[in-house]
Every structure is written in structure tokens, then in C-alpha cells.
Design a protein with these regions (language model features):
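Short glycine-enriched, charge-decorated loop/helix-capping segments at active-site entrances
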Residues: 35-41, 111-115, 206, 264-265
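Predominantly flavin-linked oxidoreductase catalytic cores and closely associated redox partners
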Residues: 112, 117-213, 217, 221-223
């Protein structure tokens, strides 16, 4: 959001007075809150995506990946094109809006065994994976395998976790009639939240309402519960319970971009230190 909307404001300036360039490794802007709907098929991907050049017709756009920020030299290193050649881009002023990255290191095993919901590719991967689980569960004679295939675990009860759980539950309910060997009570959704309620960012009334809706839809809610470990076919919870599963979707844990970490910029708790105008001093 930050980079695109900063450029959107800047393009209102006199175009001949400034040379404004936006660099991104995607040539489209994606509205992340809609990714769960894309994953579930509720909306087409086009409803969540807008081409950047269409949004910013007056801005020079470069489809490239930034690999390094050289603050003292006042340039950035990018790789672009099919051959991924390095280029140096000089700047007078730099707006950094790289966002954060998923931190899969916070739980042992999470990095190797979970999905995330941050990109369009993530949404497609989760959708295709779930359909694959249904296909195999419909034909397998192995009851233990079937249970793992039909246990869906979402880690994190914030906005993304709740939306992901709700959308994928709706998608699964729509799929069930087409898989004759899968009974409704065999499909189980689980959401794990460390705090005492779902959607802790919102009011208690909304949290309680969401909890009631989830329980009504037979979604297992684990509150005041954390993951302690993750394996290829199982998660272990802090309450001593474990869940056999082939599907773990993590919506928790963010960390500062590696590029920011290596930039030499002043950081505190993984965030760039700025003044009240969001300027880095020094």
C-alpha cells in the first residue's frame, strides 16, 4: 500500500519538475485483504489485482527486484529481465515501502511445513492444495491419511486468519457434494490464536460474534493457545494437544525485510527509526 499510494500522490506534482520512478518485483498492485476470497474462488483474481501502470500513468515504472540499498552512495541495486542482470539506480530522495516478510522461524518446523497468505501465488497454491486433498481423500482407503487430508489448520486469529478460515470453510462446504466418499463430519477446520479472543484488534463484541459464528459452523477454535512445534503431518499445541494434518496455513509472524536489515539504516525492534515526518535522520 505505502509505495503505490505514495507514488499516486507524487504523480500529482508537475511531471516536468521531477523524475519519479517506482520499482517493484510485481507489475500489479494486489489488495491483500481479498486474497482469502481469491483462494476460495469467491472472487476472481482480477478483482483483487490492478496493473500498476494503469494506476500510475504519469509515473515511470520499473519491473525489477531491489537487492540492496546503498544509502551513502544514494543508489539502489536491482535485478531485472530474464537474465536478471544487476543495475544501479541513482536517487536524490528514496521512499522505502518494502513492507515486512513472513517470519516462519518463530515456531520449530513451521518454515518447512506451512502455507502463507501474502501473495497471489499463495492464494492459488492453497486453493490447489485443498482441492488435491479432497481428491485424494475421496479415493484413499487409509483412514489415518484421510483424517490428515481433511484436517485444515489456520494459525493466527487476527484479520487474515479469521478471513482465511471463513472463506476456505465456505469453499470446502461447496466442494463436499461433489465428493461422495467424504462425509461432512470428516472435514474439520481448526484456528489457533495465542490471545484470549479472536480478532483481538477489534472490540470484544465483534470477537464474541465471530467466535459464535465459527462454533456454529463447526470450526474448532483454540484460544490462549500457541504452536510449540510443527512436523510434516502434525502440529503440537501449547495445551498438550496435537492435530494430524496435511494443511497448515500461517498468518502469524512478520519480520523486517532482509534488504532493510542490510541497509545500514537505524533500526529499532525491526523498524526504521524516523522523525515525525517519516524521514531518516543522519
Amino acid at each position: 500500500f505505502g509505495g503505490v499510494y505514495s507514488a499516486k500522490r507524487l504523480q500529482k506534482l508537475e511531471p516536468n519538475s521531477f523524475d519519479i520512478e517506482l520499482i517493484s518485483n510485481n507489475n500489479y498492485f494486489i489488495f491483500q485483504p481479498l486474497l482469502p476470497e481469491v483462494a476460495s474462488g469467491t472472487i476472481p483474481a482480477g478483482d483483487a489485482v490492478t496493473p500498476i501502470r494503469q494506476m500510475l500513468p504519469k509515473i515511470k515504472f520499473r519491473h525489477a527486484e531491489i537487492t540492496k540499498i546503498n544509502c551513502h552512495q544514494k543508489n539502489v541495486v536491482v535485478v531485472q529481465g530474464m537474465r536478471r542482470r544487476e543495475h544501479l539506480i541513482d536517487f536524490d530522495h528514496l521512499v522505502i515501502a518494502l513492507g515486512q516478510e513472513s517470519n516462519k522461524q518463530i515456531i520449530p518446523g513451521l518454515k518447512h511445513h506451512c502455507f502463507t497468505m501474502r501473495t497471489l501465488e499463495d492464494a492459488y497454491n492453497i486453493r490447489n492444495h485443498l482441492i488435491g486433498c479432497f481428491e485424494l481423500a475421496d479415493v484413499t482407503l487409509d483412514k489415518k491419511l484421510k483424517r490428515k487430508l481433511l484436517n485444515i489448520v489456520v494459525v493466527g486469529g487476527g484479520f487474515s486468519g479469521v478471513e482465511t478460515t471463513g472463506e476456505l470453510k465456505e469453499m470446502s462446504d461447496r466442494l463436499l457434494p461433489y465428493y461422495k466418499n467424504i462425509k461432512k463430519n470428516e472435514l474439520k477446520f481448526h484456528i489457533v490464536e495465542f490471545s484470549s479472543r479472536l480478532l483481538p484488534e477489534l472490540s470484544k463484541e465483534i470477537s464474541d460474534y465471530t467466535y459464535k459464528i465459527f462454533k456454529k459452523r463447526d470450526i474448532n477454535v483454540y484460544l490462549k493457545t500457541a504452536l510449540s512445534n510443527v512436523s510434516i503431518n502434525k502440529i503440537f499445541l501449547s495445551n498438550g494437544k496435537s492435530i494430524d494434518t496435511k494443511t497448515i496455513i500461517s498468518t502469524i509472524g512478520s519480520t523486517v525485510s532482509k534488504i532493510i536489515n542490510e541497509s545500514g539504516l537505524p533500526l529499532k525492534n525491526g523498524k526504521i527509526i524516523t522523525n515525525e515526518y517519516l524521514e531518516v535522520e543522519g
